[in-house]
Amino acid sequence: MGDDPADGRRGLNRSLDFAGSIENTYICGMLPTLRQLQYLKFLAEHGSFGRAAEAAHVTQPTLSAGIQELERTLGAPVVDRARSGVILTAVGEEALRRATVILNEAEELVEAAKNAGQPLTGRFRLGVIPTIAPFLLPIALPLLRERFPKLRLFLREDLTQRLIASLKAGLLDAALIALPYDMNGLNWAHVSDDELFAAVPADSVLAGKESATPEELEREGLILLEDGHCLREHALAACGLKPPKAADEENFAATSLPTLVQMVGSGLGVTFLPGMAVEAGLARAAPVAVRRIEAAHPSREIVVAWRAGSNRGVEGKLLAETLRTR
């Protein structure tokens, strides 16, 4: 049997009814409380009223009553209740998405009020990409502790795409990332330019030269980080090279720079290393030679980024300024 058009109309009407209920709620001055939104967040995270109540440090009846009040305010159920636990409805999913942003903004408000006139004090959530974290943080963290003793730094290491998504969602205050990258909706401050080098087997012909051309590196067989690591795109773009064929990448790819160095040292091919990794001595972990790349601008730009319009912009600039003086 075909789809019943009435089902589509009922779904559309349901959406319109929900939108209408939101509008009517606003007009009547009935808005969800932050506590109710927190209850919804705990419920989504823990999957049951009992565990959510424990996480919220309230009784189960209190949390249940808060969710019911939220549903009355929104004019629609936010969860489906079952013996196996609770599942968010479509309305609940949308409410949770918006609640997450609202709760993060509320936390930012509290932190901003506490730290007014005292930047980089209190909680600060900083994201760092994997090709920066192990090389910059050992230098940066002691410096930040010395200059900002009241700073409580929470670090998250992840790929650029996910860090930017977290910035825009208000889950991070700033992130140390590398450009070029699509920075729509973000502001940033320059930290440094990081030159890219070629890492080749110590017994290879290229090891006997002072520098290598992109074409020479390509002929030796490129080994790159897995797709998603921005260093991969930066190096290829700087050298004017195309990504290796999919069939080749299935055999030779890595998830970290230390693994790449070991693969090069074993004679599997050549790769690119950022200058900060070379300075940290990463290439000394295997029989590898580091050579300059004969290209116009074989480098990436290290920046501190934050969400456009965020009140953390002043602190983002101060963080970048501090890291520039390291």
Give the ranges of each region predicted by the language model.
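Interdomain hinge and pocket-entrance segments immediately C-terminal to HTH DNA-binding domains
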Residues: 33-34, 84, 90, 114-133, ...
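Short helix-boundary/capping micro-motifs
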Residues: 41-62
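A short LG(V/I)-centered, amphipathic sequence patch enriched
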Residues: 49, 71-93
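Central regulatory/effector-binding core of bacterial HTH transcription factors
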Residues: 121-184, 256
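A late-sequence structural motif
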Residues: 136, 268, 288-326
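Hydrophobic hinge/microswitch elements
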Residues: 159-164, 168-172, 177-178, 228-289
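Flexible hinge/capping segments at coil-to-helix
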Residues: 185-222, 316
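Secondary-structure junction motif
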Residues: 221-243, 312-316, 320-321, 326
